[in-house]
Amino acid sequence: MAESRANPASPGTRSYFNAPVFAVAPMIDWTDRHYRFFARKLSQHALLYTEMIVAEAILRGDRQRLLGFDASEHPVALQLGGNDPVKMAEAARIAEEFGYDEINMNVGCPSDRVQSGTFGACLMQEPETVAACVAAMKAAVRIPVTVKCRIGVDDQDPEVALRTLVAQVVEAGTDAVWVHARKAWLQGLSPRENREIPPLDYGLVYRLKQENPNLFIGINGGLQTLSQALEQVQHLDGVMLGRAAYHDSAMLTAADGHFPHPLTGAAPVAQEAGVFTERGHRLDLDFWADVRDVMADYAAGHITNGGRLIHVTRHMVGLFQGWAGARRYRQILSSDATRQGAGPEVIHAAFDAVFEAMAAKQAAE
């Protein structure tokens, strides 16, 4: 079992998860409950995050719609947006009642919409506010409370800004810090540009870990492959992939062979040589047939409850990159899933296009 690292700033409380942790980053409009259900079929050990949900929305809105999730999604963390300690604490308490495994505070999103609410990355300029929110949430819940931040914003010196924030949230009792290892520019860059243009500084995050050996520190930003993720955990306690894991979701099937289960500490799953592609995609067609059947059943249930097939299948389009039949798979999901009355048969047809192409390829070899 991997070592479980406890935060010395909060003695007696539950420690954070078993390291090293592999996580899929919170992504607005992407990591909704349908994506997380799908991702969990691909990896049992990945820590999954919700898209950011504003604390005020939880207090005033439809909590079941905002917070409800399938039990199979565990381990699953809720990312909260906000800056009011009282509201953040109450939202965290409600989320704990729903069964989430972690509450994560967003101190990294630079979008105009998030800035207009004075939360997200702009809170890098208000470490005292972040610390107050962390302390209030820690007092309200028993599950881990964590922070996801940038290394700084605008003209801040990252060497100072990151250390200042981390020192204050450690004092407040945070269980972990996840760092997107680049600055955010609050004006002049779009959210997409803020993920690509500011230079990465992994070295600063490594130094932060050396200075805080008992604090769980994970890294995010610029990571595209499982190999790159494995390199990061030579230095840190966790690694978080975002869009790469979403657009090439089959890579999640290899994660369990390298990372323990965050909650149980179950060891990485032994994987036979030759059962994965160079991209880290599992080749076992029986496994993929099970994914097909489970997702078709899930989609049928969603449709029965008034939803549309596209709500589910939009998260599945990136599967099978580089495989025979992948183009036809994408065509089916992109076109047929949007038609009126589309049902789970579309998922069967898309997967079967890959299976048939793979069988033809193998027969020709």
Label the model's feature ranges.
Residues 2-11, 16, 27-101:
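Glycine-rich, positively charged N-terminal anion/phosphate-binding segment
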Residues 89-103, 107-119, 128-215:
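Alpha/beta enzyme core
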Residues 65-69, 121-123, 163-165, 194-197, ...:
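Short, hinge-like loop/turn segments at secondary-structure boundaries
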Residues 27-29, 53-55, 81-83, 108-110, ...:
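Active-site beta-loop-alpha junctions enriched in small/polar residues
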Residues 59-63, 115-118, 158-159, 189-192, ...:
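Short secondary-structure transition/capping segments
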Residues 1-18, 22-23, 28, 135, ...:
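Alpha/beta catalytic cores of nucleotide-metabolism and tRNA/nucleoside-modifying enzymes
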